[in-house]
């Protein structure tokens, strides 16, 4: 039994490999590279008059949850025998929402009986949590028949990129600083997610959540690129992914402010034979109210079995370099945490 302690809003997963039998050398078939355009400028919005809590797949296979604020789709990948590299690409543009919003690209864990989809359908519910440890923070840690949603990437939407980016826009045309030549039309983030491939292999449900409360919302695109090894004997290692915690409030959950009051502790088991174990940590520093860490330096600490393994302050002082993605906002002069508007959040 291992003990994990956190003091920051986050998504965490453990990835590890199991020992392989090197003696069983053989030539493996090539299945080729795979490119999947999961979403292509798909609206992410808040339209309770059009989308109920659960909207079945449309002609493009897109499922919508929580009144359109989550888009979800089933993907299928070849049954690769050789090792692969996996890259995720997410592109977002405003469709009329001019504000900065938190966003999450995720996959539903296959081993979880309870997930966002059947919760939205009203068929299941998040399991109860120990209120002495987690207060009312349902859905953030594993429970009976439940594994937290596995986050692939987290991001912050820019202020109005795309919708307000034209040269003659009444809002932004007079706000462009002299040091940028133009407003960008969208923002794109790219992330290596090879370690998380086991959650995607064969079939999986992947999605994007944006915390928008407007009918216009955003348009989002998502691409997956899987590159197969060219080495004929490069066998796919036995990787495993274990989602430990996810504090994104996807559906009917509480805003994750528990870290302002206490450290969060959870138990997890690690196989004795596991090798190359990695702790994947994604931190969000957004929300400046009541001592929030958007403009205040807050230390992020992770401990395993009482031993500190991570201690840092997510912080940047080059806000101006992202100004071109934010036509619907004013001048940026103040250093901020990792939640730069138009920046993918810190992945460790």
Which residues make up each language-model segment?
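Ser/Thr/Pro-rich, low-complexity mucin-like regions
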Residues: 183-248
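Short amphipathic, basic-aromatic surface patches that mediate peripheral association
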Residues: 92-96, 282-292
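Short strand-turn-strand beta-turns centered on an Asx-Gly dipeptide
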Residues: 299-311
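Conserved small/polar residues in nucleotide/adenosyl-binding loops
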Residues: 346-348
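Short coil-to-beta strand junction motifs in C2/discoidin
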Residues: 98-104, 290-301
